[in-house]
C-alpha cells in the first residue's frame, strides 16, 4: 500500500498547507481546487478563491509505503504531523490542526461492531 505527504504552497504570500492522501497528490490538489470553487470555508479553500488557483502549486514531500492499511494510516499521520511542524504550516500557513487526523477509518473492532 502507498500514500503520500504533499505541500500546497501559495507563492503570493509564502503560506504552505501540508496534507496526506492515498489517491495521489495531484488528484488531491484538484479536489482542493474543486472544493474552493464550491465555496468550502476551509482556510486553504478561501485562499484559493482569494488569490486564484494560479498562485498555488503542489509538490510531493514523501511517499509512504506499508504492508497494511492500518500501518499506512499510522505512518501517514506521523509524517503529516512531522511536516506540519517542520514547515510551521499550522501557525504560518493554512493547516488548522497539528495533523494526524486525516484519512480516519474505523478500527477493525469498530468495523465488527457496526457490521
Label each residue range with its predicted role:
Residues 1-113:
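Structure-specific nucleic-acid interaction/processing domains
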Amino acid at each position: 500500500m502507498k500514500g503520500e505527504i504533499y505541500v500546497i504552497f501559495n507563492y503570493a504570500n509564502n503560506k504552505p498547507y501540508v496534507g496526506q492522501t492515498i489517491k495521489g497528490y495531484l488528484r488531491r490538489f484538484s479536489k482542493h481546487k474543486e472544493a474552493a470553487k464550491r465555496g468550502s470555508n476551509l482556510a486553504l479553500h478561501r485562499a484559493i478563491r482569494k488569490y486564484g488557483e494560479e498562485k498555488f502549486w503542489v509538490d510531493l514531500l514523501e511517499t509512504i509505503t506499508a504492508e497494511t492499511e492500518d500501518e499506512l494510516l499510522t505512518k501517514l499521520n506521523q509524517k503529516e504531523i512531522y511536516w506540519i511542524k517542520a514547515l510551521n504550516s499550522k501557525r504560518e500557513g493554512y493547516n488548522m490542526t497539528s495533523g494526524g487526523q486525516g484519512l480516519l477509518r474505523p478500527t477493525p473492532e469498530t468495523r465488527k461492531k457496526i457490521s
